[in-house]
């Protein structure tokens, strides 16, 4: 943690003062006994008291880390057997500071009872015994270098056995990490590997998405190798796109980290280089991690220290409970109110289970499979996600998961495939593969906990979906807990697909609790999902829950607390809890005007008081309950109505809301949750009203945020939300108007009981939503309201004026009937009903009877005309309105009232002009009394408007009335006129003052005409422009005042320095500079003449005043002033006016229409008569009110509303709501269509389709390749089938007693995939890489036997071209051996198509040949194409490998003879090479091969029992060649350990026997192993040489084996099986390895010194013919070759067709190696027999 440098700086200053004052104190200044404390002591104490606690806190934190965490260091040097210069801990002996071997011995002699030196040296190094704990010395912050942006990460070095609770405390408290909702533990290969680009992209994207959406932690190994490198790449891509950092914790061993010394330091910031040293075995940390925990067990360069620590930490984190939300504790019974904004007691609502953990497997070695088993066996088990296609362990796990059955069982054939796959993948022996297979099958016993992610599969498109699905499957939790997990992860897709499934049982109330959590956490998709699955919001939402939602801490920051504080007009206590009544006051404050929230009405307050009142005595005192009672009500009525409110608390519906979506939308708006508010707006009734209310609330909150000097972003965001809701309201109105105009108008005028009994038009005006008012539907309604019941289209103004001036003309006007006004106001409806009730019904009935009689008298012909006439009469009847009704409707129309008031106002102004222009008499004239009466009655009308307004309290009524601009100006004008009238009635001089006030007052009444102009379509916008320009000019005047003052004061002070104090000075300052703005520059006063006297032309002398000091400055500053004022500021004002003009011009239509509404509503509510006749209307209204109170004492005055409200019944209201919901559905459907048809969406869909098509094409290509490979495999198997058919034909020929010669011909044509020595001889020629051809001549039996016949046509497909790949290396030493690793030479064997193609060459001189020694092999070879051919005997020959004179088949120089040990297990004889003459040609005959002398053979060859002639049984078809002259081209050093040659299919691999000296096999990589070599068996290889024999060979590897077998730590870590135990398990594993290696012998893994295991040589990437070609191929069953051979071996009566006649053997060739040696049956024993 960073140190408080300011505190340290202050403490340093305090120390300086302390030193100075201590010196002063020492001088004896304050040495009295009773003197006060010295000043330095006081300062020191103050500093300690103020700042030392923070310093002590920092020190305490540092000391806590040092006390809690330790490091381990090796304190006992035990030299390693591999490297004597290193200790067993991995460090050099010199790196052990303060320790030497002798010192360590002495220390151990003291501590361990004086053990002997031999015992100490034989002692094994142990962590517990030979390491020492000490406080950690490495923790702080890492700054990774080497990139464009230096990433930072926290780190700490801890012991490997640290308690996990300390680590969790470190992460949550010191590192300030939030407890995760998910823990993803990534495991995989430690060695670097490559992923497919598409798979890497999907893996990274899915991992980041899973971590971001769920708030997860990611655990990795921390180092920059293997799978961790791929995780770092994904984090790097995410960091470049998003600022949020994912919590990625790397748990790495301290001993494997490179540049450890750079990290040592306590609470430091260390730079760290990410470039790794290629020569070092250590690795660097990954720079994209956020935190590192470095586990230390005292070792260096070894993995394993982090395994136990990581697993224990994961286990401890999984025990922590997930807090899905943190809510204030709330009990409905006790009603305990805790703090919300301050420190409060919180009830952590968990899900009952701990943090879920999931293991993610990508690639990996054998140890990963053991880790998976450990996860699955844990309690509770940890689910595992395997990424198929990443390679190695992941693919093996995926294959086992796919083909294994329940209980971990697998098919026998698939078992063999899996074993072979394990062998080839990890280069394992059969025993090791079986051991790993057992572990794999143990994992498959819990395969339901394993989820396999396959890229492109239909089940899992993304890896994050696989991770979360695996967690839900493995959690074994109830449905509510699973839903809480999905809610915490914010993954609604998981909840929809995995939790809300058919047949799921839900406890009572569980979904409601989930709904509450979703609302608190602002999970809109979950709220929608829960509503779709049956959650009733009407039952869910109660008063307590809604209040709980208002007091939640979660969600975005909002201004609700500040609004409540403003409403309360004071600071709130720290433990204050917001109530719904407070929310009601806030809503009323934001809505403004006369809006009344339901939360503040009497019924709700009484209910709230009855429910929670006893525990909250101050709740109602803060509200002012009496403000909702109209002022005109008496006290008795108030008490009576309070007594009438009777609430049944037992009613279950009393605690619920009738419109829950309304309340939730308002909650979302006030809490600034826009997405949630939009969702609730779509549901429920009255969508248009909700949109307008939300628009007004957001706009008011934005205004409050800007007034409170909050961040501008808050105000801008709220304004944006307001515009969104306003746009929704307009679009919904447009949609409803398109469908039905009449119903759309009803939507605008019907009364909204849930929204303060207002209408949508009133809400739109309150929100100042000009676009809504300017809509065509609203304007049509306003036009009808403006006309009232008058039916006029043209010249309406003239007709109305004519009706006012000539009342009889009213009879000629047309009026509308009731059917033409379905959306009339409530007052008009009531009045119309009352008038219709008073009219007699008899004349109408009589008229109908007369019409019926007239119709009956008419004939059929004129029936239609009578019907038309009847319809016209009915229509005319409806248009007939009584005279009284016409007069009433005429004068009550707003347009008539407007012109009536306008004419009266014009008359008032004319009279006012008269009284101010003529001489004022002592007493007012008649004209003046009329003006006075007009102003007086106008004041009474203003008082009526205030009293008749909707707000309850008088003060609130006044505030609402004063919000209108013209009302304020009217009040000022009336008061000013009243003052003038009072002064006018007085004597002089007050009468003159009154007259002046009259003259000033008339100015306003002329300006008042602008309000009348607002009704005009053309003049209205200009009035709006004038108002805005006046506001702009006010800002300009302030700027102008500054410039004017600066010049005016300077000018006045210079020109008039001797002025006396007077108010004239203020006038003189502004007088001239102000008029200069308008062009009056006062030229004669700019530079008046002064100084010396001037003489005119006529000789007169003019005396000039003396010049003022500095008078020349005035013209200069005046020039600057005029430049700024006249040019700059005036033009600036013109530009501002121009901008305002264009701004208003663009919205002039909306502005005029909005002002028109105000005017229409004003005249709609005014009385009929204008002032001064309005007094009669007032008297009539008072009389009606008194009569109403006398008739109905209990009537509610609020029942009759004179506003623009439509009275409709409940059925009609339901129809209106249904119509509105249909409009919403249609609106969203059209919106979706527009979105889908937009260019951006089309481009996005097209890109997705192209990407999907590319993926499909890739899959098609992969399938095509696999089909090709399968076809090749089929070809190979067909060839094998042909081979079997050939064998069957041979057996049939033998049974039918065919002749020997014909049988031999047929047998000579049969071939095998695993080419034997006889087959090599039959190929007739060798083609070397240099282009030389070596032909082989067929042996001709002396007895006259026929030569080998051409191959049968049935066997022609078996002819192939086989090639030898040999490796050559000169016998060089040192670096030359490593440089010339191998030299490839290719020898091809071509089968002769006929005997005529075999060249008859002269025979070479007979000589003892030691060429092809055939040794029996205990392993059964299979029908393979690729084999290994080793030449072991040739290793001791001193022939130069580059000598071209040496025969390929082994005819060496005549001067050497070297014993060669046999490779047979029981062989003790040696084959000796005899000198012979060099053949003249490089060709050799077949006779030479068959006649070569073999002086000594093994006992198996020389002592064969007579009863079992090897030629009596059927000759085997498969052989391994153990000697070949081609081995001279092979390397003689074990370089093959580093890189194995790649063997092509259909090839032989010559491998030197010296490569087996140290029992090392040649790991062969094969391309196309899934196609050509799928049928290859790994058992068709030669057995390696015994360990005991390697010492007899020169250049053996007996001394430097450990140097060659050292491998990288990542390789060791992958091959080792992780264990949670310490060194005891390591010792057990070491002893078990030695025991296994001693039992396996030649067929098992060879164990060398230092416990380094080397697998025996096997054909890698191969399968036997009995096994399927690949894990995904179909199985094919065939008989084993060894089974056939076993059956044939028991058939003693059968004659071998290949057996030659003994008499045909020439003399002198008894020692020769014949073909019988090449086809020895005992060399082909079953492979399984050795393992069984």
Curated annotation (Swiss-Prot):
It catalyses: Ca(2+)(in) = Ca(2+)(out); Mn(2+)(in) = Mn(2+)(out); Zn(2+)(in) = Zn(2+)(out); Mg(2+)(in) = Mg(2+)(out). Residues 617-625 are annotated as: Required for the inhibitory action of G-beta/gamma-subunits of heterotrimeric G-proteins. Changing residue 1084 to Q: Enhances pH sensitivity. 1,2-dioctanoyl-sn-glycero-3-phospho-(1D-myo-inositol-4,5-bisphosphate) binds at residues 796, 1017-1018. Residues 919-925, 986-989, 1057-1111 are extracellular. Keywords: Calcium, Calcium channel, Calcium transport, Calmodulin-binding, Cataract, Cell membrane, Coiled coil, Disease variant, Epilepsy, Intellectual disability, Ion channel, Ion transport, Membrane, Transmembrane, Transmembrane helix, Transport. Pfam families: Ion_trans, LSDAT_euk, TRPM2, TRPM_tetra. Changing residue 1380 to T: In NEDFSS; uncertain significance. Residues 1635-1653, 1690-1701, 1720-1732 have a biased composition (Polar residues). Changing residue 1087 to Q: Enhances pH sensitivity. Residues 1459-1478, 1611-1732 are annotated as: Disordered. The chain crosses the membrane at residues 895-918, 926-948, 965-985, 990-1013, 1029-1056, 1112-1137. It is a multi-pass membrane protein. GO terms for molecular function: calcium channel activity; calmodulin binding; G-protein beta/gamma-subunit complex binding; monoatomic cation channel activity; phosphatidylinositol-4,5-bisphosphate binding. Constitutively active, non-selective divalent cation-conducting channel that is permeable to Ca(2+), Mn(2+), and Mg(2+), with a high permeability for Ca(2+). However, can be enhanced by increasing temperature and by ligands, including the endogenous neurosteroid pregnenolone sulfate and sphingosine-1 and suppressed by intracellular Mg(2+). Implicated in a variety of cellular processes, including insulin/peptide secretion, vascular constriction and dilation, noxious heat sensing, inflammatory and spontaneous pain sensitivity. It is linked to Neurodevelopmental disorder with hypotonia, dysmorphic facies, and skeletal anomalies, with or without seizures: An autosomal dominant disorder characterized by global developmental delay, moderate to severely impaired intellectual development, poor or absent speech, congenital hypotonia, dysmorphic facial features, exotropia, and musculoskeletal issues such as hip dysplasia, hip dislocation and scoliosis. About half of patients develop various types of seizures. This is Transient receptor potential cation channel subfamily M member 3.
